[in-house]
UniProtKB/Swiss-Prot annotation:
Main location: membrane
One of the Pfam families matching this protein, by short name: Syja_N
Group of enzyme by EC: hydrolase
Region feature (Disordered): 429-476
UniProt source species: Arabidopsis thaliana
Membrane topology label: Peripheral membrane protein
Tissue: Ubiquitous with a higher level of expression in young seedlings than in other tissues.
Identification of the protein by name: Phosphoinositide phosphatase SAC2
Length: 808
């Protein structure tokens, strides 16, 4: 048989294995769901019992019917129930989201309308356009609890999770996994519904425990999906940007901060950028992807939601002196992506009142502490760069500097690229057992440890399949694998982080186009129309993720300036977004957090236990209030919050512990010295010498060997993005004519004082990687800026221009 014929036959077979359209019928005693495949060749029947008031019994008919046989079955059901009203049509639907129970009956959530978002290798990706909640038991058997106020309130709470916004799925492609993972060899494990990115994992547990496969349900991923068609040199290609939000430790801005005991962080989002050339049949021949990650700083910290304070204090807890949760977090990243793990930390280095600087110092301590137990090749690679400060410096091209950092990271991790054969396109592409793609801890893996031969170019990798002939058909040339990941964070992991992720995506975009043979160069200039197209998509993604976690669109000041938008209009936009975020955090987030906890199954109502809205804080009650003495008690307004994950029902899959690198982490019990008030100050003459040393032309970042970086454990960049060695101190703490301080009254001692309340065992000398630029300061802007905003009230302008404004 010719290869093309095998491909056609395979597509028919695969189209028959996925149910994509359903019709729901009801009798007095049962629901009947009829599902069919895309090709209308296979019809299946699912039965749900309606006679139990507080239970749901699901039965799957294993017979694959033809269309005629299916309608004959329905006719017989109708005849058998004629005395009680017969069989009635309820609705058409496109998949079951899941089942949920509060205090009374079970409910079924279904998709009643879908919208096409794009395609990956011929596999359609859909969004939810409309959904419906259906009560399972018949009205005649419902108890009074089903009509109680609490039951109705829980139901309304569930409905506040808008499934029509930012939820997406695919019948035939594992959208919860990265492209590299989907094309890697299969490994045994749990079903793909237990992925950290499948938000209806809890809702589908009951049906997955009752039926043999998951053809009746869809795996919903929450985040962002955007696909566009672009062209370069008259060559067409598709760009797809996917963000997957983790369901672990999920929630809203002030109610979910930092890390939990399992090493899971708030606002954990995986972003994948896929580029493929568009062949004549619309399917890709060559395809490339790159993955990056964002997530809250993995320490135990929190902020009190306040209606009186728009910028609450940061509370750092001393509950984890050995950084065990931080270690667990990076171990998980290592299992998912491999090594190296590059950490781009964008938070502030100097403040009038220490807030972010407290976290910066402690995060540096944690990284240093963890790295002491790792080999050189497996160490975390931290890059600390104050984006807020440098975005205010006149003449500083923030995106260009971030691009050089991205180049450094990509040189370490590379991108994924492969050549697809015709048999791997269309509906036949993903012929994999859905129960073979998970780790034991229920978190999807992107990284497969390569064999010795996998580093060779033009490697042929095979999909796991029982048929030898199928293995020969399903081959692909893999010339590049991504090994490791860039993890970016600021405080909220929204605004500054999104700018940095765009810069990383742009550098990767150039390499992807070059790998696909669409461009001769690997570089894309910031003024290139392709860069503008990509910036628009990342800006939209940033707005979407910010609305989900922060309650407002992202602060896009740098993007607006890049487009040449009128400065006063930008400032006005940023101001109103700050107010919107404040209002959402202060007045809306508590209920939103409750809804998330119910949807994810982190809170399951019980009639003999307090209701969800009667419970207290969702945050760490025992957090050490480092700044409590400096903040009047009247400045805080206590807000009701929902349960934290430490006190909620455990998930089905316990977290598995594993090493960050091949050698694991060694336990370190000995005390390590750190910064204190006795730390030596740097004199003016010493500062001048350091500033002078930066003027010498050092080797560029890309040419410096990794061994040098690991040996020095520290590097910085000058204004040209070039490398220099600076042992064991942070260049952001050095004040000189070329490195201006945002607040002259805020010296290095301010940062040192933030260590005073840290336990002695956690004071570690911050020997970290630092990226710094040298340039002049322009905090207040120039004369043209002042004229542009002359029509705006002075108090508003002063608030906007203040260094503690809330844009960054």
């Amino acid at each position: 048989m010719a290869a093309s014929e095998r491909s056609i036959d395979k597509e028919v077979d695969m189209g028959s294995s996925f149910l994509q359209k359903f019709r729901l019928y009801e009798t007095r005693s049962s629901f009947y769901m009829i599902g069919r495949d895309k090709n209308r060749t296979s019809w299946r029947v699912l039965k749900l019992d309606r006679t139990e008031p507080a239970e749901v019994n699901i039965y799957e008919d294993s017979t694959a019917y033809t269309e005629a046989e299916c309608f004959e079955t329905l006719r017989r059901i109708h005849e058998g129930n004629r005395s009680s009203g017969g069989l009635k049509f309820v609705t058409t639907c496109y998949g079951i989201i899941g089942f949920i129970r509060f205090l009374g009956p079970y409910y079924m959530l279904i998709i009643t309308k879908r919208k096409k978002l794009g395609e990956i290798c011929g596999h359609t990706v859909y969004g939810v356009a409309k959904s419906k909640i259906i009560t399972i038991p018949h009205a005649s058997v419902l108890s009074n609890v089903a009509y109680s106020k609490d039951e109705k309130r829980y139901k309304r709470l569930l409905c506040t999770v808008d499934l029509t916004k930012d939820f997406f799925f695919s019948y035939s492609y594992h959208i919860m996994h990265t492209l590299q993972r989907n094309l890697s060899n299969n490994v045994e494990g749990h079903t793909y519904y237990e992925s950290m990115f499948v938000w209806n994992e809890y809702l589908t547990r009951r049906i997955r425990n009752n039926v043999k496969d998951c053809m009746w349900t869809v795996a919903l991923v929450y985040g962002f999906f955007k696909q566009v068609k672009l062209s370069v040199s008259e060559k067409n290609f598709r760009l797809t940007l996917i963000s997957r939000r983790s369901r672990h430790y999920a929630g809203t801005r002030y109610l979910k901060r930092g890390v939990n005991e399992k090493g899971r962080v708030a606002n954990d989002v995986e972003t994948e950028q896929i580029v493929f050339e568009e062949a004549q049949d619309g399917n890709p021949g060559r395809i490339s992807s790159v993955v990056q990650n964002r997530g809250s700083i993995p320490l135990f910290w929190s902020q009190e939601t306040s209606r009186l304070n728009i910028k609450p204090d940061i509370i750092l807890s001393p509950k984890d002196p050995n950084f065990e949760a931080t270690r667990l977090h990076f171990e998980n990243l290592g299992r998912r992506y491999g090594n190296p793990i590059i950490i781009l930390n964008l938070i502030k280095t100097r403040e009038k009142r220490p807030r972010e600087t407290i976290l910066r110092a402690e995060f540096a301590n944690a990284i240093r502490f963890i790295n002491k137990g790792l080999s050189k090749e497996d160490r975390l690679r931290p890059l600390h760069w104050d984006l807020h400060k440098h975005s205010r410096k006149k003449g500083t091209n923030v995106l260009a500097i971030l691009g050089r950092l991205a180049t450094y990271a990509l040189n370490l991790t590379s991108i994924f690229y492969c050549q697809l054969t015709p048999d791997l396109r269309g509906e036949g592409f993903q012929n994999q057992n859905p129960s073979t793609l998970e780790n034991d801890d229920g978190e999807c893996s992107t990284y497969d440890p390569p064999s010795k031969d996998e580093t060779a170019p033009n490697l042929v990798v095979e999909n796991g399949n029982d048929s030898k002939d199928a293995k020969e058909d399903q081959q692909k040339e893999v010339t590049m694998l991504q090994k490791g990941v860039l993890r970016t964070n600021c405080i909220d992991c929204l605004d500054r982080t999104n700018v940095a992720q765009y810069a990383y995506g742009l550098v990767a975009f150039g390499r992807q186009l070059h790998a696909l043979g669409l461009t001769e160069s690997t570089n894309i200039d910031l003024d290139n129309p392709l860069a503008e197209d990509l910036m628009g998509i990342y800006e939209t993604m940033g707005d979407t993720l910010a609305l989900q976690y922060g309650g407002s669109a992202a602060h896009n000041k740098i993007f607006c300036e890049r487009r040449g938008q009128w400065r006063a209009a930008t400032q006005s936009q940023e101001f109103f977004r700050t107010l919107q975020r404040y209002y959402s955090n202060a007045y809306m987030d508590a209920e939103k957090q409750d809804a998330i906890n119910v949807f994810l199954g982190y809170f399951q109502p019980q009639s003999d236990k307090p209701a969800l809205w009667e419970l207290g804080s969702d945050q760490h009650y025992n957090a050490a209030r480092f700044l409590a003495n400096s903040v009047p008690e009247t400045s805080r307004s206590t807000m009701k919050r929902s349960l934290s994950e430490s006190s909620i029902i455990s998930e089905s899959s316990p977290a598995a512990l594993g090493p960050v690198g091949r050698h694991g982490l060694a336990e370190k019990d000995e005390e390590v010295k750190g910064l204190s008030d006795s730390a030596p100050e740097i004199s003016t003459s010493e500062t001048a010498k350091i500033a002078a040393s930066l003027s010498a032309p050092p080797p560029i970042l890309e040419e410096l060997g990794l061994d040098d970086i690991l040996e020095n454990d520290c590097f910085c960049c000058d204004g040209n993005g070039e490398q220099c060695t600076c042992a064991a101190f942070d260049m952001d703490w050095v004040s000189s004519s070329g490195n201006s301080c945002e607040d002259e009254s805020c010296g290095r001692a301010t940062v040192v004082r933030s260590f005073e309340t840290i336990p002695e065992s956690r004071k570690i000398e911050s020997e970290i990687c630092v990226v710094e630029t040298v340039g002049s300061n322009s905090r207040k802007g120039n004369k043209e800026e002042e004229e542009a905003i002359s029509g705006i009230p002075e108090g508003y302008v002063r608030w906007v221009m203040d260094e503690d404004g809330h844009f960054w």
